[in-house]
């Protein structure tokens, strides 16, 4: 597995935190959003990593809470003419790729993803051009332009199966953008993978020493880890999986206590799935005082109630997602290729970031 660039140079400025709302303001915006959803013939889809009150509102109004691909598929199958995507920008793009006829709005178009930012189109195209003999596989957490350059789009729930398939055909792989997920898949499959060196700023902060100290405090707890985490952390896990796979593991594991190494936004749905279990956040590198993300994506936190209301009310250049028609067609090819592969395996594809 080859390295691309100095990952330590990939430090992104975080957005300012949303201004906290008091209870009266929250109630006002919740009701306003409900009214606007009806007026705009819109449905709200929210990612597992958004704040609990946002996930609850999506469910209450007939929307869904899911990973980015399932959000996009739900929106595509829903009769609403407008989708309000509470997540980060590539999720809005994915929704638009699958629903070109629908209006796709976001609370803000400035909600980024470090995996997306860490895989810029021009640099990635040049990298692919320098290795023309390799099949290009990109994670769902990428821009429409990067997807359009790929042969396959993949989610974490089906990554191992897909790479095993390609390896069995003798294909050599370019994998992008997450180096930790790429390392995990390479270890599971033994495939020849040339890996882009991006990382999720949330999962990259989990560290083994702090996790082992927490395990010592709760020796009977199971450790659940997303494969975007460093491999040393993954090696400590009782269950490794995508967002939806971790929620399923939380339900099925016999342990009454769970230490969870992923964005803490997942706790809303995970606690619904196993209300009698005790959930603990896995400690991040700085253990509170100096952590950057502190186990919550700062861009996901931009999806506040006021921002959602503004997106529905105003739309326009600050909120509406557009994907060039030609680019959309190119990006749809590797996405559909993955969906067809999954259907052949009778695997339900869920669970990117």
Swiss-Prot record:
Enzyme Commission designation: 2.5.1.72
SUPFAM superfamilies hit by this protein: NadA-like
Listed pathway(s): Cofactor biosynthesis; NAD(+) biosynthesis; quinolinate from iminoaspartate: step 1/1
Any one GO molecular-function label of the UniProt entry: 4 iron, 4 sulfur cluster binding
Main location class: cytoplasm
Entry cofactors: [4Fe-4S] cluster
Cofactor annotation comment: Binds 1 [4Fe-4S] cluster per subunit.
Keyword flag Plastid: no
GO terms for cellular component: cytosol
Family affiliation: Belongs to the quinolinate synthase family. Type 1 subfamily.
UniProt protein name: Quinolinate synthase
Gene it is expressed from: nadA
């Amino acid at each position: 597995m080859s390295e691309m660039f100095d990952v330590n140079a990939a430090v992104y400025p975080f957005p300012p935190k949303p201004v906290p709302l008091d209870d009266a303001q929250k109630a006002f915006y919740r009701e306003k959003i409900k009214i606007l959803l009806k007026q705009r013939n819109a449905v709200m889809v929210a990612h597992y990593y958004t704040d609990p009150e946002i996930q609850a509102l999506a469910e209450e109004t007939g929307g869904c809470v899911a990973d980015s691909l399932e959000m996009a598929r739900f929106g595509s199958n829903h009769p609403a003419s407008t989708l309000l995507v509470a997540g980060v920008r590539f999720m809005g793009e994915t929704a638009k790729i699958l629903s070109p006829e629908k209006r796709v709005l976001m609370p803000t178009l400035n909600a980024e993803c470090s995996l997306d930012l860490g895989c810029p189109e021009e640099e990635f195209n040049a990298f692919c051009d320098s290795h023309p003999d390799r099949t290009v596989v990109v994670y769902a957490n990428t821009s429409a332009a990067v997807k359009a350059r790929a042969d396959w789009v993949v989610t974490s729930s089906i990554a191992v199966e897909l790479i095993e398939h390609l390896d069995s055909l003798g294909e050599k792989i370019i994998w992008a953008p997450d180096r930790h997920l790429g390392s995990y898949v390479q270890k599971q499959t033994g495939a020849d993978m040339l890996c882009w060196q991006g990382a999720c700023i949330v999962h990259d902060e989990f560290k083994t020493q702090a996790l082992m100290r927490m395990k010592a405090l709760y020796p009977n707890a199971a450790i659940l880890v997303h494969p975007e985490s460093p491999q040393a952390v993954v090696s400590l896990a009782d269950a490794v999986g995508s967002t939806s796979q971790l929620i399923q593991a939380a339900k099925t594991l016999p342990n009454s206590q769970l230490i969870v190494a992923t964005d803490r936004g997942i706790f809303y749905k995970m606690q619904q799935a196993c209300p009698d279990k005790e959930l603990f956040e896995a400690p991040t590198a700085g253990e509170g005082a100096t952590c950057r993300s502190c186990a919550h994506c700062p861009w996901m936190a931009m999806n506040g109630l006021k921002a959602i209301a503004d997106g529905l009310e105003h739309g326009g250049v600050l909120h509406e997602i557009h994907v060039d028609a030609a680019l959309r067609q190119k990006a749809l090819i590797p996405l559909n290729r993955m969906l067809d592969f999954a259907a052949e395996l009778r695997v339900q594809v869920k669970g990117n970031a």
